[in-house]
Every structure is written in structure tokens, then in C-alpha cells.
Design a protein with these regions (language model features):
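N-terminal and secondary-structure boundary signal
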Residues: 1-292
Length: 292
């Protein structure tokens, strides 16, 4: 059984976002349930490309600011980071609004440059490497964006942790996984379970439908979700936008591997009732090959 909190939030107005995040996290027991006071915490955002927040390609900076403020109240030292496939995070952080949040709230921007082998000796990908910089933090809070994904269907909490692979190494691991999407999904699940973010907060105020994860259309969804189990929160998002979970590769892989909560019946909802959300006609994306 996993707890998933889900609350309504209609706009990226900072006051509204802050109120919604407070309600979201309080319903799960408060931020102190996930981090210790004074911890070094990484906010793992989604910076696919250095695009403006209005494009909905990246985690919205209002979400990042709101979460950072919750952590700062708990005397945490907050860092913001990701590893885009092209360029550096610090180089793109300003375009996406992350650098401005860091300056305003007193956070630090961190690049992922060096790789270290993940302890995954019992997994399918025993030698997978992730950014060594993530070892510097006491906790990681995962901040994905609800977007369609041309190869995997949706990109959510589990997939977002692939950003902890150093950018220059991403192509190598894509090629190592090959063109079998179920096999690639197992790698994504192993990265997620190996890193173990303490909390996943999913930005679904305005998501992306259609030709995601970069060229789709912004779609107002009006929701923020949080859970310590990204598989569970991804499952809830799939139901919200009418994706059959068994057709999403990461959810299918997680269920097969016994990681996370795989059935909606095994989720305890917090915040607001799941039945109060009605998202219709969310435009899916035609799936393409993993080949480059």
C-alpha cells in the first residue's frame, strides 16, 4: 500500500502553488517525514532542453520555488540539478527559470559531470553509471513534469531519474539497452530504485499532450501529486489522463520487477478525492522506435 497525495492547482501563480504544495505535503505527514532538519537536498528537475517555462517542456519554476521554500523552512540546504543530453544544466538553468529561483530563495545550481557505478549487482544492468554528484546529498526530491513521450508513452517520475545519468553518457545507455522498450524500461526502473528519491512531486498544473516530450501542446490539467513511491504516483497520472497502465513501459516493468505499487486498488489517496478530477480527451502521442 502506497500513499499518493493529489490536490488541485489551476495556475502557476506562486501564492496558489505554495498553498497547494503545503496542502499536498501536509496530507502526507509534512516535509519532516521525508528529510531530516538541516539536510542537503537535491531537487531533481526536468530540463530536457533550455526552454522557457511557458513551453511546458521543463518542470515549472513555481513548483521548484515552492518546494525549495518548504525545505528552507526546515533549515535544509537546497540544490537544483539535472543533466540534459546536450549542454550543461547551469547553462540552461536561466532559460527555464531555475537560476532565478536559486538566486531568489538561496539555492545552488549543480551540474552532473562525473559518473559512478550504481550499486545494482542483482539487477539486469549491473554496471549502470549515474552522476557521482548525487552522492553529495542526504536526500533527493524528484520533480517531474507530466508530458507525453514519443518513445515511452509518458515521461513521469520514474523516467525523470534518467536525468541522473551524465548527459554525455545517455546515448551510450540508450544504445546498451537497445530498441526493446521493455528492456529499456527495466533500466529506467533500476536507476529509479537504485537512487531512491525520498519524494516525487509531479507538476501537472499544465502538462504536455500530443507530440511530447518537446514539441507537444501545453494542456491544462490542474493537478499536483506527491508520493514517496514514484511508481504509484505515475500509475495515478496514467489513470488521470486515461492511459492504460499496462501499455506504459515503465509501469509494466516496475510491476514485473516488484518495485513500487502496481495496482490502483493498493493506493491510499490523500489530499483530495481522485474522483474529483476529470481530465478528458488528453491527446496521446504515436509511439516511435528507440532507434537513433
Amino acid at each position: 500500500m502506497s500513499d499518493v497525495s493529489i490536490v488541485k492547482c489551476e495556475e502557476y501563480n506562486q501564492e496558489e502553488v505554495d498553498r497547494s504544495l503545503e496542502k499536498l505535503i501536509t496530507s502526507l505527514g509534512g516535509i519532516q517525514r521525508f528529510v531530516k532538519e538541516g539536510s542537503k537536498v537535491l531537487l531533481k528537475v526536468n530540463l530536457l532542453f533550455p526552454r522557457a517555462p511557458s513551453s511546458m517542456v521543463t518542470t515549472h519554476p513555481a513548483i521548484v520555488e515552492g518546494v525549495a521554500k518548504l525545505l528552507k523552512k526546515y533549515k535544509c540546504e537546497v540544490f537544483i540539478g539535472d543533466s540534459p543530453a546536450i549542454g550543461s544544466f547551469s547553462g540552461g538553468a536561466s532559460a527555464a527559470g531555475f537560476a532565478q529561483v536559486a538566486d531568489k530563495i538561496g539555492c545552488k545550481i549543480v551540474d552532473f559531470n562525473k559518473s559512478v557505478r550504481l550499486n545494482n549487482t542483482s539487477g539486469v544492468f549491473k554496471d549502470i553509471e549515474v552522476a557521482s554528484e548525487i552522492q553529495d546529498f542526504d536526500a533527493i526530491v524528484n520533480l517531474p513534469k507530466v508530458k507525453t513521450h514519443g518513445q515511452m508513452g509518458l515521461t513521469l517520475g520514474v523516467k525523470n531519474m534518467f536525468g541522473c545519468v551524465v548527459g554525455t553518457k545517455k546515448l551510450y545507455w540508450h544504445l546498451r539497452a537497445g530498441i526493446n522498450k521493455d528492456y529499456f524500461a527495466k533500466m529506467l526502473v533500476e536507476i529509479y530504485s537504485g537512487i531512491k528519491p525520498v519524494l516525487t512531486i509531479t507538476d501537472g498544473i499544465t502538462g504536455m499532450e500530443g507530440n511530447g516530450p518537446q514539441w507537444g501542446r501545453p494542456r491544462k490539467l490542474g493537478v499536483i501529486l506527491a508520493s514517496s513511491d514514484a511508481v504509484a504516483s505515475d500509475l495515478v497520472v496514467a489513470h488521470l489522463v486515461n492511459y492504460a497502465p499496462e501499455k506504459l513501459f515503465t509501469l509494466r516493468a516496475a510491476k514485473e520487477m516488484g518495485i513500487g505499487t502496481a495496482r490502483i486498488e493498493d493506493i491510499k489517496f490523500r489530499g483530495e478525492p481522485f474522483s474529483s478530477f476529470d481530465i478528458v480527451d488528453f491527446k496521446k502521442v504515436p509511439l516511435s522506435s528507440l532507434e537513433f
